[in-house]
């Protein structure tokens, strides 16, 4: 009953949020949405998902690993560091995402493919770029098929608090929610690149990583 109520609450947040949209600016550190706005409804849904995520059996609880990844994320996030909460998830695929409320998910499959700290910084910088540009709410407002969002939210809701395959479904739902347009991906790349290079990491690291990931993707086709 709890998970069903959670799914209904998230769906209601989605539908209520579709009704209104205030003009957006890039995130300033410590920004919170206006009460009653569509963005506040999306934050509410993500806050609920985050509460359940903290109990996930897939959450990696190694303090040293979490501190290290958060440390790199904070360096690229700069003034936004205090807004971030990083969760490392034990999932073998390459993925990272960041919700508008500051929740960042980082899958261990990315660690298997990243060769050095500079590449890690580019992945994290890319996600903080999505966050500072507020791509999640922009994407939400642009979605014409609300059922796609409802399906993704229900994957999150019904996977929350469960184990095994259901938890993987939840994470798949989170990934679906934060699947952005090519223009948004390019903007996040540019924002991440500027942040990473400003911290002194190699400017070629991101291109090297994406090239390897593209080749890996081609081998699956």
Give the location of each predicted region.
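A Zn2+-metalloprotease active-site environment signal
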Residues: 6, 18-221
């Amino acid at each position: 009953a709890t998970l069903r109520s959670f799914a209904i609450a998230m769906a209601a947040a989605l539908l209520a949020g579709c009704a209104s949209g205030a003009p957006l600016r890039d995130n300033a550190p410590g920004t919170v949405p206006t009460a009653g706005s569509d963005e506040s409804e999306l934050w509410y849904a993500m806050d609920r998902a985050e509460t359940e995520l903290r109990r996930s059996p897939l959450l990696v609880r190694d303090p040293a690993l979490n501190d290290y990844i958060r440390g790199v994320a904070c360096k690229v996030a700069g003034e936004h560091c205090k807004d971030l909460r990083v969760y490392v998830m034990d999932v073998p695929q390459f993925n990272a995402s960041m919700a508008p409320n500051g929740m960042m998910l980082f899958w261990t499959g990315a660690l298997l493919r990243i060769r050095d700290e500079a590449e890690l910084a580019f992945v994290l910088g890319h996600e903080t770029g999505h966050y500072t540009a507020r791509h999640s709410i922009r994407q939400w407002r642009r979605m014409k098929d609300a059922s796609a969002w409802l399906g993704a939210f229900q994957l999150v809701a019904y996977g929350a608090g469960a184990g095994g395959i259901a938890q993987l479904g939840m994470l798949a739902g989170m990934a679906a929610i934060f699947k952005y347009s090519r223009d948004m991906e390019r903007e996040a790349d540019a924002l991440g690149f500027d942040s990473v290079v400003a911290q002194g990491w190699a400017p070629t690291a991101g291109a090297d990583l994406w090239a390897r990931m593209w080749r890996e993707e081609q081998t699956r086709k």
